[in-house]
C-alpha cells in the first residue's frame, strides 16, 4: 500500500495553488503502479478533495482522503465526509471574522474544518509580518477553543484537532492485513501524525529538498529521488 501526501510531496509548491500540478512523470508512474493490481494507492492531503480531483484529473479512480481526513473518496467515486462539531464551527467562524478584520482575506483559504493563511510569494519582510500577525490573532483562539494552529510551508492553518492525517492512516490500517507492506510519503509537520501511526508497522518517508527533524525513517529529495522511488516500486510490483 502506498499512502501519499500531495503538496510538497507529489507536486512542487506554487504561489497559485490551482497550478500546483504533480512533478513530471508522477501521474503515469502512479497509474502504472495501480494498473498492476498489487498496490492500493491513496492520497492523504490537507487539500479539499474537489481540488485534488482537478489536479489529478487523469486518475479519476484514485482513492483520496481530503481536508486532513474530514473527506474521503473511494476508488469507485463514492464520497463521504465528517461533520464539524458546533463548537468547532463557531470557533472557525470567529477565526474567519478575525481574518476579515485584519485585512488578510486575500491571503486566506477557507476550507472544510479549517482556515489557512498563505504568504508564499511575498517579500521576506512582508511574509514575516503576515506570519506574526496571524500567530498573534489566532494563537489565543487556538488555546481557548481546542483548535490546532499548525505551521506548514509558507503558511499557518487553524483547524479542528481531529481527524488528522494520523486518524486517516489509522482508519486505513484497521481494514488492512498486517502482512501488507505499507509506505507513507509526506513533507510537512501535519504528516508527522501519519508517521507516528506507522511506527512499527510501515515505512515513513520524508519528501523534502532540505532535511528537517522528523520521526520518518527515510528521506527523499524531490523530484529525482521521489521518481526513482516510484520507479522502483513499479518494478517491484511488476509494472
Label for each model-derived stretch:
Residues 1-16, 43, 169:
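Asp-based phosphoryl-transfer active-site loop
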Residues 8, 64, 117, 169, ...:
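Residue-level signal for inorganic ion chemistry
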Residues 21-111:
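Active-site phosphate-binding/coordination module
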Residues 40-42, 63, 148, 183, ...:
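A structural signal for isolated positions on well-ordered beta-strands in alpha/beta enzyme cores
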Residues 47-67, 125-146:
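Substrate-recognition/cap helix-loop segment adjacent to the acidic, metal-dependent catalytic center
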Residues 67, 74-90, 144, 150-178:
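Substrate-recognition "cap/lid" segment bordering the active-site pocket of phosphatases
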Residues 106-124, 146-159:
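Charged, glycine-interspersed solvent-exposed loop segments at helix/strand-loop junctions
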Residues 166-239:
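Mg2+-dependent phosphoryl-transfer enzymes with acidic/Ser/Thr/Gly-rich catalytic loops
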Amino acid at each position: 500500500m502506498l499512502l501519499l501526501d500531495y503538496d510538497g510531496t507529489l507536486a512542487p509548491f506554487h504561489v497559485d495553488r490551482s497550478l500546483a500540478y504533480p512533478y513530471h512523470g508522477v501521474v503515469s508512474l502512479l497509474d502504472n503502479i495501480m494498473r498492476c493490481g498489487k498496490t492500493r494507492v491513496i492520497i492523504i492531503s490537507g487539500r479539499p478533495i474537489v481540488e485534488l480531483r482537478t489536479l489529478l484529473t487523469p486518475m479519476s479512480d484514485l482513492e483520496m482522503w481530503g481536508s486532513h481526513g474530514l473527506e474521503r473518496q473511494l476508488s469507485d467515486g463514492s464520497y463521504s465526509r465528517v461533520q464539524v462539531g458546533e463548537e468547532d464551527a463557531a470557533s472557525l467562524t470567529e477565526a474567519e471574522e478575525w481574518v476579515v478584520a485584519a485585512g488578510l482575506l486575500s491571503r486566506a483559504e477557507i476550507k472544510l474544518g479549517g482556515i489557512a493563511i498563505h504568504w508564499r510569494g511575498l517579500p521576506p519582510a512582508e511574509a514575516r509580518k503576515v506570519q506574526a500577525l496571524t500567530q498573534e490573532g489566532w494563537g489565543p483562539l487556538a488555546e481557548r477553543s481546542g483548535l490546532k494552529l499548525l505551521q506548514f510551508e509558507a503558511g499557518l492553518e487553524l483547524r479542528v484537532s481531529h481527524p488528522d492525517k494520523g486518524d486517516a492512516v489509522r482508519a486505513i490500517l484497521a481494514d488492512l492485513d498486517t502482512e501488507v507492506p505499507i509506505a507513507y510519503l509526506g513533507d510537512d509537520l501535519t504528516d508527522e501524525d501519519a508517521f507516528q501511526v506507522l511506527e512499527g508497522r510501515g515505512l515513513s518517508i520524508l519528501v523534502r529538498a532540505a532535511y528537517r527533524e522528523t520521526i520518518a525513517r527515510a528521506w527523499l529529495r524531490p523530484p529525482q529521488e521521489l521518481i526513482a522511488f516510484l520507479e522502483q516500486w513499479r518494478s517491484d510490483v511488476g509494472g
